């Protein structure tokens, strides 16, 4: 029969007196020394995880920065090719103007041998326009050069003053290996911040350069289509001159110089043509 343990005459049984007293503390049966070791391991585990995480993030950002710099270099090389293409198209246009002048002279020659030599000459070909210097390309080149010469930490200027731990916590770990780990974490965070600023500036410069090159592509397309139309028209003019004017010129030359051979006639025609240039 069970007895009330609060009775004055209650005596514990032999079995109950040998049972251990249950502990309700969070550390269970740990001693004070074991508890301190436990917290030390937890602190070091947390710091190590933070250190590893910032190291990985820093490497990823540095790699992204290198990719961005490489993209900038490729974009600048592409601009150089586009500029050369535009210059060539401008030179072709200038050549077509000279060709048109010669065609007009040929038309005048075949249309009338005695046309007034003092007739106003066709307009001189305009000078080849120069491709304007791009501000976006200059800025992008400067940014890419700075990042390439300085690496991922080109703009890193030391600790920013912001710390991951409070002053009291830093004082508690001063002189321990944890202080070195915390310092490395702070340095990684500062470098990550610098990488992010570099990427932000690089991204803005890349965007402006892409917009500028898109405008250049529109100009190139217009000039290519313009030159193609002019060349086609001049080809038709030349075919017309060769089809109708050549026979008239040949008849005139034969009537004036019946004894001339073909090469002499062609030479005479070329000299006559030069008079109207």
Curated annotation (Swiss-Prot):
Keyword Lipid metabolism: no
UniProt xrefs under PROSITE patterns: T_SNARE
Domain t-SNARE coiled-coil homology: 44-106, 179-241
A cellular component annotation (GO) from this entry: plasma membrane
UniProt KW keywords: Coiled coil, Protein transport, Repeat, Synapse, Synaptosome, Transport
A GO BP annotation: synaptic vesicle priming
Matching SMART domains: t_SNARE (SM00397)
Keyword presence, Repeat: yes
GO MF terms, alphabetically ordered: SNAP receptor activity; syntaxin binding
InterPro entries given in the database record: T_SNARE_dom
Subcellular compartments: Synapse, Synaptosome
Region of interest (Disordered), residue spans: 1-30, 49-73, 117-170
Superkingdom of the organism of origin: Eukaryota
Compositionally biased spans, kind Basic and acidic residues: 1-11, 49-65
Disruption phenotype: RNAi-mediated knockdown results in the aberrant secretion and processing of the aspartic protease hrg-7 with accumulation of hrg-7 in its immature uncleaved form and in the intestine.
Composition bias type Polar residues, residue spans: 14-28, 134-170
Protein family (similarity comment): Belongs to the SNAP-25 family.
The protein's role, per its UniProt record: SNAREs, soluble N-ethylmaleimide-sensitive factor-attachment protein receptors, are essential proteins for fusion of cellular membranes. SNAREs localized on opposing membranes assemble to form a trans-SNARE complex, an extended, parallel four alpha-helical bundle that drives membrane fusion. Plays a role in the processing and secretion of the aspartic protease hrg-7 from the intestine.
Protein name: Soluble NSF attachment protein 29
Source organism of the structure: Caenorhabditis elegans
Gene designation: snap-29
